């Protein structure tokens, strides 16, 4: 019966989702007395807002280019309407499903006043139906030379839905919204803005038994760790929200956009720019830009391993024998490892396990003499492991509960989140004393132990009905939680005095996470070839997140999520997948391995001499373009432009680049990379924009008129080309020749 309920619930969710996706966008009727409000232009700093009384339309331009509209309402239709609704939100282990019951829909809009007051355009009127109404105010004001702020507020806040509707062009593509992993162009989709567990499979797993077991944890094509209310479009338009509550960008119709925010107050900014890179640079003045990585990160591979001191020494020796450049060892099980129903997980009690890693100080010192760092792991959960783990010195869960540092339920009890086969409390980051306490744990238990960085995991699971110390609504704080988690980690390394030399990498993110985090990684991809949750999704998400300011990002080499249930199809890492992920990752910002959720089932780099040599080769290739990577990291820090780029950013006038989803990417402005992302393939297609391109491996030249080429004989390498006359391309190729890695 329990299984039947799960299957029924899953089918119901799918049905509701599909029905919702087919619903037409409701555009409100607009009532205006044009005799009282005739056509007029309003100067708002560098912007001109034009009211056309005949078309019943607002249009906004920047005075730097009066021919280009950066925002316009739909002709003869309203642009604001509202509703009163009841939230119906279900969550499980950081996965959420949002539904609502609409009580009243206010489908008519009136405009009663348009006034220029203190260089702000103030528009007032009502949204209403035959029975109820509320007054609204919309204020436009300049936010610098390239941003126009808009602020919509309902007088009666029982109407807790604001809908903001405006026009789009038929062929306009929309990019961004954080780390969208299933598609790069979001046109035709509804994009929810909510930091989430991305889910297992996200639609790639078709086995009904697995999906029934997963339930909400299966995810869907729009559930993502990094969710940001921001986009750029191929019409060189851009917009972002300042709201932190749940919202939806409805792009399902070709000629309009509708933003649905679950609030009575909507605040955002419209960005003006002449190119996609200009739009990103302007946006990141708000989101923040990522600081430069410590130089040691680029010196070689970051090796993810578990198993203790002796195993680390053994695997280090094997890597050294192959001449593998190593930047760090990442030992996520520094706190000890537990076996759960899904595989190998960790004891979430943030102190060193001296039994698993004896002679720790000696290990740190020995690695340090070879210029190799040691990295660890932490997250904002705390598990009560008393009586389960025998060698604990601190009961961190007890400390948190005693001091009131855990998020609570309405009855005052700690809100325990079900993980796999254990529960964990989530620390309350709205409590200033808790923030000091967790920072001291990071300083005392991680930094003082010699760790030079760590994975700062999770931060997606704050429940919708939680009770917070500050009294803030979790509906507004949920997305902020990940930003604050990044901020605390950043403050800990800065206050320790080692800030420039340390790096932590996070998987979750909201609008201003790039301001605080030193690095991102893409979370838990399935160890598969899928487009929704596999190697392809990692490539799509990497390029998508770069649009929204996540300029330094990478994925686990080989993927992470392993599915090993009896009877049904298993998902375990193959040697071929591991090798292809190695090849792809060598051309991204960070080259880091992960054993995966079930290390004994997944193929590892140490499982054969062939894969160990392959890994060593690509670690050398990764190191060989360090000189250019550092230039791009500097550029990301000063402009917000990502290191790894979708080709559209460099070739915005080439319409063919808009069709690229995961198939290829650019390193900076000079290299085009097309990894092999299909099983049992040794060739791939690569689109090269107009010009002459040089093959990195053999120096042959391809002259392109803006066309695709089939590149063959890619048994153990991706297709990589650089622009003719690129000095960085020449240096990279010469470095490879010196290493014996290119002809």
Predicted regions and their residues:
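Aromatic-lined carbohydrate-binding/catalytic grooves of carbohydrate-active enzymes
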Residues: 292-471, 514
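Secondary-structure transition/capping motifs at alpha-helix termini
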Residues: 291, 320-327, 356-375, 398-399, ...
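Catalytic and substrate-binding clefts that recognize carbohydrates or anionic sugar/phosphate headgroups
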Residues: 25-296, 302-306, 316-321, 650, ...
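Catalytic core of carbohydrate-active enzymes
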Residues: 490-503, 508-522, 545-555, 560-743
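Alpha-amylase-like alpha-glycosidases and glucanotransferases acting on alpha-linked glucans and related
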Residues: 403-451, 486-527, 593-611
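Sec-dependent signal peptide recognition
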Residues: 2-10
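Boundary at the C-terminal end of the N-terminal hydrophobic targeting segment
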Residues: 21-23
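Bacterial N-terminal signal peptides
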Residues: 9-17
């Amino acid at each position: 019966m329990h299984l039947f309920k799960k299957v029924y619930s899953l089918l119901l969710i799918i049905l509701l989702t599909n029905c919702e996706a087919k619903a037409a966008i409701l555009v409100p009727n607009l009532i205006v007395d044009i005799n009282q409000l005739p056509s007029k232009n309003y100067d708002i700093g560098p912007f001109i807002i034009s009211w056309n009384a005949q078309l019943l339309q607002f249009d906004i331009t920047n005075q730097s280019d009066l021919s280009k509209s950066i925002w316009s309402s739909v002709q003869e239709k309203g642009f604001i309407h509202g509703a009163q609704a009841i939230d119906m939100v279900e969550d499980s282990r950081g996965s959420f499903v949002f539904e609502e019951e609409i009580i009243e829909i206010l489908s008519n809009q009136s405009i009663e006043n348009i006034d220029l007051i203190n260089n702000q355009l103030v528009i007032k009127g009502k949204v209403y139906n035959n029975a109820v109404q509320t007054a609204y105010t919309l204020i436009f004001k300049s936010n610098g030379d390239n941003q126009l702020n808009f602020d919509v507020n309902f007088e009666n806040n029982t109407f807790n839905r604001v809908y903001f509707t405006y026009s789009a062009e038929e062929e306009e593509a929309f990019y961004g919204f954080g780390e969208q992993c299933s598609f790069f162009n979001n046109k035709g989709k509804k994009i929810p803005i909510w930091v989430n567990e991305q889910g297992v499979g996200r639609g790639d797993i078709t086995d009904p038994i697995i999906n029934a077991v997963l339930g909400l944890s299966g995810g869907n094509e729009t559930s993502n760790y990094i969710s940001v209310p921001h986009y750029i479009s191929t019409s060189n338009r851009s917009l972002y929200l300042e709201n932190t509550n749940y919202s939806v960008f409805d792009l399902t119709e070709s000629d309009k956009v509708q933003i649905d925010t679950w609030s009575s107050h909507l605040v955002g900014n419209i960005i003006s720019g002449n190119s996609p890179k200009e739009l990103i640079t302007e946006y990141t003045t708000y989101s923040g830009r990522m600081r430069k990585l410590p130089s040691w990160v680029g010196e070689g591979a970051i090796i993810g391993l578990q198993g203790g001191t002796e195993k680390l020494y053994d695997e280090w020796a094997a890597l050294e024998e192959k001449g593998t450049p190593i930047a760090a060892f990442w030992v996520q099980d520094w706190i000890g490892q537990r076996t759960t129903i899904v595989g190998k997980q960790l004891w979430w009690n943030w102190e060193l396990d001296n039994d698993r890693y004896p002679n720790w100080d000696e290990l740190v010192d020995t690695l340090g003499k070879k210029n190799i760092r040691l990295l660890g792991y932490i997250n904002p959960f705390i598990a009560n492991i008393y009586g389960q783990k025998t060698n604990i010195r601190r009961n961190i869960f007890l400390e948190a509960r005693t001091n009131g540092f855990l998020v609570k339920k309405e009855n005052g009890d700690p809100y325990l989140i079900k993980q796999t086969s254990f529960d964990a409390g989530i620390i309350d980051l709205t409590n200033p004393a808790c923030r000091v306490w967790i920072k001291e744990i990071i300083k005392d238990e991680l930094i003082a132990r010699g760790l030079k960085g760590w994975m700062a995991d999770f931060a997606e699971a704050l429940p919708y009905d939680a009770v917070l110390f500050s009294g803030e609504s979790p509906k507004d704080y949920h997305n902020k939680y990940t930003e604050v988690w990044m901020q605390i980690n950043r403050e800990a390394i800065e206050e320790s005095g080692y800030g420039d030399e340390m790096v932590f990498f996070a998987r979750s993110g909201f609008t201003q996470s790039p301001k605080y985090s030193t690095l991102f990684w893409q979370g838990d991809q399935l160890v598969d070839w899928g487009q929704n949750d596999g190697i392809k999704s990692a490539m799509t998400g990497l390029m998508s997140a770069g649009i929204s300011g996540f300029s330094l990002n990478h994925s686990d080499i080989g993927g992470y999520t392993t599915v090993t249930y009896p009877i049904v199809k298993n998902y375990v890492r193959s040697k071929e997948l591991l090798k292809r992920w190695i090849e792809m990752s060598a051309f991204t910002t960070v080259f880091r391995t992960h054993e995966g959720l079930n290390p004994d089932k997944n193929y590892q780099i140490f499982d054969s001499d062939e894969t160990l040599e392959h890994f060593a080769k690509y670690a050398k290739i990764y190191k060989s373009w360090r000189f250019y990577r550092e230039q791009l990291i500097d550029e990301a820090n000063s402009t917000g432009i990502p290191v790894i780029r979708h080709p559209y950013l460099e070739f915005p006038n080439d319409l063919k680049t808009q069709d690229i989803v995961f198939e290829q990417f650019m390193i900076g402005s000079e290299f085009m990379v097309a990894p092999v992302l299909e099983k049992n393939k040794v060739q791939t297609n690569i689109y090269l924009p107009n010009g002459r391109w040089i093959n990195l491996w053999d120096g042959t030249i391809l002259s392109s008129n803006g066309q695709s080429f089939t590149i063959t004989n890619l048994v153990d390498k991706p297709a990589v080309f650089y622009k003719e006359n690129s000095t960085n391309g020449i240096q990279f190729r010469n470095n490879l020749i010196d290493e014996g890695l290119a002809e």
